Design a protein with these regions (language model features):
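Conserved active-site loop/cleft motifs that coordinate metal ions or position small ligands
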Residues: 95-101, 115-121, 134-138
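Short gly/pro-enriched beta-turn/loop segments at secondary-structure junctions
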Residues: 4-5, 13-16, 72-77, 93
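Glycine-rich, charged/polar anion/phosphate-binding loops
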Residues: 4-8, 66-68
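Glycine- and acidic-residue-biased ligand/ion/polar-headgroup-sensing regions
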Residues: 84-110, 114
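Conserved beta-strand segments that form the floor/walls of ligand-binding pockets within enzyme
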Residues: 3, 20, 99
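Ligand-binding loop in jelly-roll beta-barrel domains
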Residues: 6-27, 122-144
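Short acidic-glycine-tyrosine-enriched beta hairpin
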Residues: 1-3, 106-127
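C-terminal amphipathic alpha-helical segment
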Residues: 27-87, 91-92
Length: 145
């Protein structure tokens, strides 16, 4: 598990497979974009000045193991790595995202396979046939207080 707080410069290499949890914002400031293009073939806009203004160079990126059964709580979200079976309940007041890491979940006539995600609404409880290894991400509403 690698936690990269906002304001930290970062990049992904070609072929990287990541499970990214983003904050509830549509703001992205780009220093460089490898000449990528949008859906119209136009190079995506860079935001060098604004990126420098919001950069937090003293922040530390943390890297830890994230083994089965572990839970990590941060200001922005909680993330759990577990095996789900029988029932799955979201006790939070916000929706959670359940992503299947290994295995297959069957629920209410739907199937969710490895690499797929479902949205579990606040206080929703679903019945599950089978079991699967999953990551459950729940955002925290930290900006309203």
């Amino acid at each position: 598990l690698i936690y990269i707080p906002s304001g930290t410069i970062h990049a992904l290499t070609k072929g990287a497979l990541v499970y990214e949890i983003q904050q509830a914002t549509d703001i992205t400031y780009r220093f460089y974009d490898y000449d990528r293009t949008d859906e119209f073939g136009k190079k995506r806009q860079l935001h060098v000045k604004r990126a420098v203004e919001t950069l937090q160079p003293m922040q530390k990126v943390t890297k830890t193991t994230f083994k089965l059964g572990e839970e990590v709580q941060l200001r922005e979200f909680t993330i759990k790595h577990l095996v789900v079976e029988q029932t799955l309940k979201n006790s939070a007041d916000v929706a959670s995202v359940v992503t299947i890491v290994n295995g297959v979940l069957k629920m209410a006539g739907s199937v969710c396979q490895s690499g797929q995600s479902i949205l579990l609404l606040p206080h929703e409880c679903i019945s599950i046939i089978g079991k699967a290894e999953a990551i459950i991400a729940t955002p925290h509403i930290y900006w309203s207080s």
